[in-house]
Amino acid sequence: MRGLTLSRPLSLDEHVYGLGEKAFDLDRRRGFFQLWNVDVGYVSRYGWYVDPMYVSVPFFMVFDTKNAVGYFVNSASRIFVDVGLFRYDRLTVFVPEESVELFVIGGPGIGDVLRRYFRLTGMPFLLPEWALGYQISRYSYYPQDRVLEVVKRHLDMGIPVSAVYLDIDYMDGYRVFTWDPQRFPRPGELAEKLHEMGVRLVTILNPVLRVDQRYPLFGEALGLLVETEKGEIYTGTMWPGKSAWIDFLKPEARRWWSGRVRDWAERWGVDGIWLDMNEPAVLGEPQRDCTIDPGALHEVGGRRVRHAEAHNYYSVFQAEATFRGLVEAGREPFVLSRAGSAGIQRYAAVWTADNAPSWDDLRLQTALVLGLSVSGVPYAGLDIGAFAGHRHYRSPHLNDLDLLVRYYQIALFFPIFRAHRAPDTPDREIYELPDRWREKALRVVRLRYRFLPYLSALVLEAHEEGRPLLRPLACYHQDDENVHAMYDEYYVGPYILYAPLLGREDRRPVYLPRGRWADFWSGRTYEGPIWIENADELPIYVKEGALIPLSAEGGLDFLLFGAGGRMKLRDGTVAEHRDGGLVLTSPKHINEVIRLGERVERIRVGASTDRVI
């Protein structure tokens, strides 16, 4: 096989993070990986150690207790990476190209490497505040009246909802940018009523057009489609039947798609776009990984490029065009993409896609989202409750409500907080649950909203400074060998350590690294490094020096533990804890100041102020 081999020594005390969505331990040592985006459900069986998956990022870092170095291979081809599996003392990258850009990114810290990677490939987009809330979805909510009923039932029971998603069944014959006239006879009215309830509308789009002369968009897009080596339109099977793929590598095609997204959002009140099947997936082509023929042709800068050389960046270019269309429509752009690669962070969030409910999967989802975060994909989530039903995997856990609640709990701080399920699964909206499990799930959702000001501030930090929301413990404790492979607890921003429960038991060991910590619930303090046992089903620990804004009725609460905390809020206000008091650069309505210590002290303010002593 022709190509380039890049290799470097790998010592026993070095660890490796990155490579995107990998069903593997957070530390990639002793793994062999392909970077090639696929629709996992059609190529293999979703689960631990399945490779490849939906999001392939040709970026990784090698670190020890003192130093970290990053490597970015600027290629969209099928890359193979051996992280000390076949040769214990070598890390080897094979790229099937005769030349490639390789960027070496200095540290010395893990966070330093990440920030420089973002400066190289693009800073994360500013995720809208509403996109941090609870999003509800199903394959599929229809007809139109049912969508409104589902949202209303949530709100009537005091369950906050920020957005509702429409899957492919809203379309007319699965043609993008159309509405099924029977199921959705008044789509503009749908968005209007949702907006009156304070809920956004997100619709799914696929990267294909039905090959049909009666479908106006197919005629418009002639000359903008992926072609065969003979210069004919490349066709295959997708949801509409015989389909053609838009060539998103072609600037004219991206401009055309942006225009369609703009018109769609403006005309129908759509707030966000959900991109699916954009690995790109082709149904019924297992011999080609269920994707476009590697010999099919794209147009890049006036030259023809084989799909094999462009594959992993296809979704990034689609996300860019979608993002720009929403901007043109005057929206705060929100795009959720199934596939991605280097640069996806500039335009879209991702989710881990078609998982099946199981206790093993619960652990896997935590590893996947944290692994994406340290691969330069800071906005990620999962299908809360798990997607797949009987048709996919015949999971014995479909009706396990304890497991369902655990999915909500692990997702508490995930940047994307969305419930989604397959059509052959039982209804699992929170209001459908028996009392015990409903209260547990609702507790998570309400706590999520309590932390929204903090999460929103972390989004601003990601956008401006290149710091992901979720951070492995090694980001702050690189010299602590205990944490290098740890994925079942992590930092949320600089001040919170979260150790979600990943089994049926309500207790687990929690490692608190060096420093002073306080239990979020009781205020009890600990001096790390120390192993403890959690006291609550949501094990949250606050680091000394914390300043955490929390939502409160009509304003904010501020949680403080020790002095020295600083946080820039979403509106640009800087809050600092200094000289024994809380100081803000602009007045805010502060409900309470909560001080953690051996007990929880609450100071009632209830006024607009820029200083609390």
Predicted regions and their residues:
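Aromatic- and carboxylate-enriched substrate-binding clefts and catalytic-loop regions
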Residues: 160-441, 476-477
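Catalytic and substrate-binding clefts that recognize carbohydrates or anionic sugar/phosphate headgroups
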Residues: 1-128, 138-139, 144, 151-156, ...
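Short alpha-helical segments and helix-capping/turn motifs at coil-helix boundaries
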Residues: 38-47, 52-62, 118, 147-151, ...
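Catalytic core of carbohydrate-active enzymes
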Residues: 323-333, 340-351, 361, 372-382, ...
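A short amphipathic beta-strand at an alpha->beta junction
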Residues: 600-612
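N-terminal small/glycine-rich loop or linker at the start of catalytic domains
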Residues: 123-137, 232-245
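Glycine-rich, histidine-containing beta strand-loop boundary motifs that form or position
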Residues: 8, 61-63, 72-75, 83, ...
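Extracellular structured ligand-interaction cores
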Residues: 54-58, 66-68, 76, 97-99, ...
